[in-house]
Amino acid sequence: MIYLDHAATTPVPEEVAHAVYDTLVSGWGNPSSQYPIGKQARDAVAAARETIAAALGCKSEQLVFTSCGSESDNWAVRLALHQNRHAGKHIITTAVEHSAILETCKALEQEGYSVTYLKPDKNGDITASQVESALRDDTALVTMMLVNNETGCIFPVAEVAQLLKAKKSRALLHTDAVQAAGHLPIDIKAQNIDLLSLSAHKFHGPKGTCVPVSYTHLTLPTKLE
């Protein structure tokens, strides 16, 4: 079979599979423990963090590993709204986001949030001017994917970031970059992105490993509810 559907998932290269296997066999210690096998696991996690952070233009402590892209999206949106709760209860997103974003927004509407869903044009594109028109004084979050998972359209996330900065908006910017990783350059600091979600299996990594990234002033949670 000739496999071309890398937007759905990607094969794991042998070197990645070997790295996972080696970790399962010889690096299985509890990273919180103080004996050698624990230190080995702790060092491996730290090295992985540094590698990913260098690729994304952020600090290693701003990375959180989750189980899937949907969890990353849910977590990022709710974190942004919680920490930016004094800005207001308005969200801007697109009508063609991944269901993890759309379903979260629907749930948030039931919790009292107002959500503006931007519709794409006939070519599937969304423009920064649409975001500008929808922007309100009480907008707390703009969440927009970087690349659409069905059409392949690239959304103007960097332009939206510049817009929010120029308007001195209090809104935070989250982007689901799951389909963009490995295809488009990503630099969280340079592109003024507050939160970003990735999923390893979309760019030849193992399934069940995803990363929501918090860049600017957001404080990552220290406990699970």
Residue ranges, per PLM feature:
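Pyridoxal 5′-phosphate
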Residues: 1-218
